[in-house]
Amino acid sequence: MRLVLQRVAHASVTIDGEVVGKIDKGILALVGMNTGDDESVFERMFNKITKLRIFEDSEDKMNLSVSDLDYGVLLVPNFTIYADDRKGNRPSFAMGAKPDEARESFNNFVKYAKEHYPKVESGVFQADMKVELLNDGPITILLDSDKLF
């Protein structure tokens, strides 16, 4: 699994003019699924999302997490995180999980997240989504389960 985490003042996902996920302060996570991602990966990566200390405390140090502050998490599927652009100018999307596996894994990841944290919203796999966000910082963190564990 690969994640692009962005600290946001607010973020939302709209599909066909309808808002399907929305948070105020928190983390927007663009989520790319890989072959073999399972509950052990979900647990480790979601713990990173909720425990990463990227919010300021009273002394303006990045010392607080989403869970410390009861902020929201917006999970947005994004297979392009696994793009390979090493050859030519057109990225290849052959890396990462195939669509059926990625859909199931993403939906299971969202289910896991919602069971373990009360403020989780999500986009929809393979939908034409419009993602709006206001970066806060900006703070952007890249996480890859193959490199973290």
Set out the residue ranges of the language-model regions.
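Residue-level signal for inorganic ion chemistry
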Residues: 45, 76, 139
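Glycine/charge-rich, flexible interdomain linkers and switch-proximal surface loops
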Residues: 58-73, 121-133
